[in-house]
């Protein structure tokens, strides 16, 4: 089990991480979400041992994780970290990059291991290609295979699918997260992609300004967000006075409402004017105005700009 106990970290007099504590059980997939600059990447580096803590402790089982002050070579053998810059060797082939840290004593075993990992990340056909000739998305997939090569106990992933095409990313995510579950590899992923959070994480940690402000299942955080900030990490969200939605007569009390939770009705207190319409494939996202406030809602068909409609909650 990984455990962080009240850790803090300062960079150039700015407190980047402040009093963070949480624990992760073996085999769990945990997502870290939050706005850019909230400390997600720094937290992964601290867990890996790349930085020294100002305060607190990090433990993996009975092993204390410490920074470069205590280790000549930072990082732990049983933990693998995939940074956003990939760190591939450009002048060696894809298969050589993936097998870089595997022993050469049992060459057939090494060859088989590399082949299976390249199949996992759908890069088998590029095995003999030098890394410098790959696209950013292809390099990212190779880097992912490489950190899995030695089958770590804990995997730290920083935006691991950010450069991969959408049509390929969905299947790749399913393959990788299924593999991690099958092998009981604990994983922490820092991401901006709500699909990675909702579909694959067992728990989600929400960060804001270097602090952990929420830890819960992704389903709970999505359905019952503690704040507009948390809800906004999953997509567009509206803050609507409850009396406009027939909840109460208290105009100061607001309800967080996602676009899919609103629908057009014949009449209601929420009268909006259509400002813009965005085609989303199976529906339109409508941007509208209510008393100088923006309200987003989904609609099955396009609406002309300036159209007045009434909204209420989907029953």
At which residue positions do the language-model features occur?
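Conserved ABC ATPase "signature" C-loop
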Residues: 209-210
């Amino acid at each position: 089990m990984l455990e962080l106990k009240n850790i803090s970290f300062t960079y150039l007099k700015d407190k980047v991480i402040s009093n963070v504590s949480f624990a992760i059980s073996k085999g769990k997939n945990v997502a870290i979400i939050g706005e850019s600059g909230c400390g997600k990447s720094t937290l992964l580096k601290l867990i890996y041992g790349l930085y020294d803590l100002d305060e607190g402790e990090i433990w993996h089982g009975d092993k204390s994780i410490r920074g470069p002050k205590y280790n000549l070579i930072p990082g732990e053998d049983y933990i693998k970290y995939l940074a956003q810059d990939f760190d591939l060797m450009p002048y060696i082939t894809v298969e050589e990059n993936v097998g870089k840290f595997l022993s050469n004593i049992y060459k057939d075993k090494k060859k088989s291991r590399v082949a299976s990992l390249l199949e996992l990340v759908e890069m088998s056909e590029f095995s003999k290609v030098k890394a410098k000739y790959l696209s950013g998305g292809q390099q990212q997939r190779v880097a992912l295979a490489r950190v899995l090569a030695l089958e770590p106990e804990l995997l730290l992933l920083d935006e691991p699918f950010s450069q991969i095409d959408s049509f390929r990313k969905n299947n790749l995510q399913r393959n990788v997260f299924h593999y991690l579950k099958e092998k009981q590899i604990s994983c922490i992923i820092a991401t901006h992609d709500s699909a990675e959070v909702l579909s694959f994480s067992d728990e989600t940690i929400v960060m804001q300004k270097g602090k952990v402000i929420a830890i819960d299942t992704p389903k709970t955080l999505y359905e019952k967000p503690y704040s507009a900030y948390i809800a906004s990490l999953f997509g567009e969200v509206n803050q609507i006075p409850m009396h406009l939605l027939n909840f109460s007569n208290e105009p100061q009390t607001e309800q967080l409402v996602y676009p899919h939770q609103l629908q057009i009705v014949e009449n209601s207190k929420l009268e909006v004017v259509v400002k813009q319409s965005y085609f989303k494939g199976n529906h339109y996202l409508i941007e509208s105005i209510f008393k100088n406030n923006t309200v987003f809602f989904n609609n099955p068909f396009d609406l002309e700009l300036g159209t007045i409609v009434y909204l209420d909650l989907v029953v």
